[in-house]
Amino acid sequence: MKLMWFHLMPYTELPDDFNKKHPSVWVDIHSSLFDPRRAHHMYNDFMDELEYAAEVGFDAICVNEHHSNGYGLMPSPNLIASSLARRTTDTALCVMGNSLALYNPPTRVAEEFAMIDCISGGRLIAGFPVGSPMDTCYAYGQNASLLRERYLEAHDLVKRAWTEKDTFAFNGRFNQQRYVNIWPRPIQNEPHPPIWIPGGGSIETWRWCAEMDYVYCYLSYYGYKAGLTTMNGFWNEMEKLGKDRNPYRAGFLQFVGVAESRQQALDLYTEPAEYFYGRCLHVDPRFALPPGYTTEATQRAGIEGMMTKAANLANPATKGAQGYEHEGHRRRRIRDRGLA
């Protein structure tokens, strides 16, 4: 197993009553809450933390892309990664990643990732998320029903730009380029830098990831128990495709608290966890699921899962196995999100 350190770079000074007075941390969060001078210190603290994670031996340090929000202050993770490429020596740099459908043309991603790979000496891990609905459909105005098609076309263009040796023309539905010939080229060219696909559980995403032989990284905010359905589905798909269950085919993001004892870890973890779950994930439902964003297979699986859960709740024999949701104890809920 390899350990990676992932930084969202959230705005750390949202007010205590944020989720009561403000409808959403994403898309329409008010600009008056942002203090650029305080953000100066935040960014430098965040960079120090990432560099320290590299120094103490994490196998990779990870950054990602979000827009118009207080949840993650990296509209361009490539800027952060390029600095880290210069300031670190042997830790992998996982940009998880660039929301491909937002780039026009997507070859900009191919070029910038190639730069990072060259600066770092071949340490880039290239992440290609489909993107959250808040980022893609609302902050950047993409059509939700076309988002995945746009994403897949952009992926094909970036991959060809990395691997084809001669200049070529690309004539897609969303991207037309007469001359594709990127300079620089990535150091990792056999055939390209490793590609990771971060996801929140969309069936189409992990199925496609399995077919492409990419690493699927599940972004789990609610513990390994909640992630079992997604990861079991991914491994079952790999088995159907006749591929081995090498654990390095998958990643699993999990929030954790570490200290000398379990109680100390819980004491240290509770306040930041409550800040993150209470404020950084305070998203207005009107931004969460635009029509056309969630695919049919994922919707069907969600409905089936709700029906199974409802059946279990109605069955007295299973009520005792429903976990912390029935305990009504705040600290237990926090614990199960990262310490269980």
Give the ranges of each region predicted by the language model.
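Hydrophobic faces of well-ordered beta-strands that scaffold small-molecule active sites
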Residues: 3-7, 61-63, 93-96, 124-128, ...
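N-terminal beta1-alpha1-beta2 module of alpha/beta enzyme domains
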Residues: 1-91, 192-193
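An alpha-helical appendage that flanks or caps ligand/catalytic pockets
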Residues: 5-34, 148-185, 225-340
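Alpha-helical packing segments of well-folded alpha/beta enzyme cores
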Residues: 42-53, 112, 154, 205, ...
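Internal, glycine-rich beta/alpha segment that forms the wall or movable "lid"
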Residues: 14, 107-214, 225-232, 236-241
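Catalytic cores of alpha/beta
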Residues: 104-114, 260-268
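Acidic-and-aromatic substrate-binding clefts and catalytic sites of carbohydrate-active enzymes
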Residues: 67-75, 100-106, 223-228, 258
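Active-site mouth loops of central-metabolism enzymes
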Residues: 28-44, 97-107, 191-201, 256-259, ...
